[in-house]
Amino acid sequence: MIAVDAPVLAELLTDGPRADAVETALRQALEGGRVVVCDAALAELAASLRNGAEVLAALEEMGIHFSPLESKSALRAGEMQRRQRQREGRARPLSVFLTGAHALLQCDALITFDAAFHRDYFKGLKLVVPGD
């Protein structure tokens, strides 16, 4: 099972400059198995793009499923955000930690543009960067 980060899906849904690379990465991931989006990524998409029903319908049409966070992922996300805030002085949004922890503990990989962040805070998580 492979998770997808909200900015990656937003790029595709808005036909951004990297949409072709995202489409290729998603197609390859779908050929290999189930592709999912977690609660935090779904909420980010609904907040930034369209209403929730349209976002969910678009994801379902692409073959992307919803995968809720388990408590272990939520706890890891909180721990990693606290660590990041202590190191850098200000915290990144909790949603990026929720997405990373979900991918690490509940999935096999994450499709993301932010490989450096995820490598730093989610050691061992396999990353797929569209276009790389």
Annotate each predicted stretch with a short phrase.
Residues 13, 42, 85-88:
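Short, contiguous strand/loop micro-motifs
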Residues 62-64, 125:
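A short helix-to-beta-strand connector/capping loop
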Residues 65-113:
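Active-site neighborhoods of divalent-metal-dependent phosphate/nucleic-acid chemistry enzymes
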Residues 1-37, 46-60, 128-132:
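Short, well-structured N-terminal submotif of metal-dependent ribonuclease cores
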Residues 1, 100-132:
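Acidic, PIN/NYN-like endoribonuclease modules and their adjacent C-terminal/linker elements
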Residues 8, 41, 73, 98-99, ...:
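Alpha-helix capping/helix-boundary segments
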Residues 11, 47, 75, 119-120:
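Alpha-helical elements of the RecA-like P-loop NTPase motor core of helicases
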Residues 23, 42, 52-55, 74-78, ...:
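A general structural signal for well-ordered alpha-helical segments in protein cores
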